[in-house]
Design a protein with these regions (language model features):
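Residue-level recognition of a conserved intra-blade site in WD40 beta-propeller repeats
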Residues: 9, 76, 125-126, 169
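Short substrate-entry loop that stabilizes the transition state in hydrolases
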Residues: 240-245, 250-290
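A flexible loop/linker signature enriched in serine peptidases of the S9 family
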Residues: 1-4, 19-37, 48-75, 86-101, ...
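Non-catalytic accessory segments flanking enzyme active sites
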Residues: 5-11, 15-20, 155-243, 260, ...
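Active-site-proximal cap/loop segments of hydrolase catalytic domains
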Residues: 268, 273-274, 281-475
Length: 475
């Protein structure tokens, strides 16, 4: 998935830096090893700056083993003397830490500016030749940070419960796109000295003036292994703590994709809350913005600690007097859809209904169907035929389809027929199993959608089916 942001002219217009994954066949399918190349328009020469070789000997001149993951998004310094880019260390692991590297075009030296910073870097912008600004996901938010290559110490500029998704700079002024769970994207100006925010646009003010939003609470939940997990709890508008409300457990996809302060018309927490539901959205194991150890834990352990994290979150909220534990549902997409399928076989009567969108149901068939072979190798531990691989065999032994005999709860299954990430046949398998077992089940297949539902009319249908199912079996 390379886009035009991965092609960068130098400021003099004489060189072009770009991302390329110079692999073919099986190697292309099982590896994420892309590199940054620089093309000189005058000489016609191309250089791989991530794996440079000596011109005379053809031998590598740096540690090749350190640059075998994704290397992406080159950005030239204003004087064209350096190139900043993002780099992942491990081949095949698309969720490895995104390190911020700087390449010196004169000396060919590499510098990792985020070696001591346990978060990903993204959206890199130079400020002059000696300072770099970037966005980092930190504790389920997205903040602007900066680092000077000469110092190498990252400074977090902004604070607060928000997602800064993109920004641009003019001199010392920063204009950024920002959203929250309760606000679609608007433009803000950011003071780089103190990180203060000043809203510039108010495109949806007339809409917000005529609707009510629910309160968003930040809740730290103790997990079964004694750690603290940040969980967003979104309450219905006009919430009355003396009343009881139905509760939804939201299972995040990815699986390495943060439950942040994102705003989406596809999975909108405020829209769910507006229907009278309390939404519980945990940042379970495997999600970024809490350090690489927290994120890495999920690989090879899909059925383990992160599932217990889900249950810790919903059980914690269910103990509140305003949460109706007799009216709880569980929803999710992609890996979240897998989570729904797995929980359907082990939830011990917690939930009254499930909704799975494009979820993984059968690990064996999924391995041979997905277009991301490097992903299943990394996250499952390997192929199903590798009987000597204990991690892989544990993954396949705990595939949701192995526990279908324990299903007993109504389930809505949604899929896109053009999904090649988690092919729609996974949803067909799950639907067939549920209906054969006599469990109330409904299949909604969009013939012109892929892994997500993007078309506006289809989105209306999706929401109608989503809330119709919950209202029937949960509310």
């Amino acid at each position: 998935y390379f886009d035009m942001a991965e092609i960068a002219w130098n400021n003099a217009g004489t060189m072009l830096a770009y991302t390329c994954k110079p692999l073919t066949g099986t190697a292309y399918a099982v590896s994420t090893d892309s590199d940054i190349f620089v093309y000189d328009l005058e000489s016609g020469a191309t250089q791989n700056i991530c794996k440079p070789t000596n011109f005379n000997t053809g031998k590598p001149v740096n540690d090749q083993a350190a640059m075998v993951g994704y290397d992406k998004y080159p950005v030239w310094s204003p004087d064209d003397s350096k190139i900043a880019f993002l780099s992942q260390r491990r081949a095949g692991n698309e969720s490895d830490k995104a390190r911020l590297f700087v390449y010196d075009c004169h000396t060919a030296e590499m510098q990792d500016l985020t070696a001591d910073f346990d978060y990903n870097a993204q959206n890199v912008v130079w400020s002059g030749n000696d300072l770099i600004y970037f966005i980092a996901p930190i504790e389920a938010t997205h903040q602007i940070c900066r680092v000077a290559p000469s110092v190498g110490e990252v400074e977090v500029i902004t604070r607060g419960d928000h997602d800064i998704n993109a920004f641009t700079m003019a001199g010392e002024r920063i204009a950024a796109e920002m959203c929250t769970i309760s606000m679609a994207t608007e433009f803000f100006e950011i003071n780089p000295e103190d990180g203060s925010l000043a809203q510039i646009s108010a495109i949806n003010k007339s809409v917000y003036d005529n609707i009510r939003m629910g309160e968003v609470q930040k809740r730290w939940v103790k997990t079964t292994d004694g750690k603290q997990m940040l969980t967003w709890v979104i309450l219905p508008p006009d919430f009355d703590p003396s009343q009881k409300y139905p509760v939804l457990l939201y299972c995040q996809g990815g699986p390495q994709s943060v439950v942040s302060q994102f705003w989406s018309y596809r999975w909108n927490f405020q829209l769910m809350a507006a229907q009278g539901y309390i939404v519980v959205a945990p940042n379970r194991r495997g999600l970024p913005s809490f350090g690489q150890e927290w994120l890495d834990q999920i690989s090879g352990d899909y059925s383990g600690q992160n599932i217990r994290d889900y249950l810790s979150a919903i059980d914690d909220v269910a103990r509140e007097p305003w949460a109706d534990r007799e009216r709880m549902g569980c929803v999710g997409a992609s890996y979240g859809g897998y989570s729904v399928y797995f929980l359907a076989g082990c939830h011990e009567k917690r939930f009254k209904a499930f909704i799975s969108h494009c979820g993984i149901f059968d690990f064996d068939s999924m391995y041979g169907e997905t277009e991301e072979l490097f992903f299943v190798n990394n996250d499952y531990g390997g192929p199903y035929w590798d009987t000597a691989n204990a991690t892989a065999q544990r993954s396949y032994a705990n595939s949701p389809h192995k526990f279908v005999s324990k299903w007993d709860t109504p389930i809505l299954i949604i899929t896109g027929e053009k999904d090649f990430r988690i092919p729609y046949t996974q949803s067909l398998e799950a639907f067939t199993a549920a209906r054969t077992l006599g469990i109330p089940a409904r299949l909604v297949a969009f013939e012109n959608e892929a892994h997500q539902v993007f078309k506006p009319q289809n989105s209306l249908v999706w929401n109608r089916e989503f809330f119709g199912w919950l209202d029937k079996y949960v509310k």
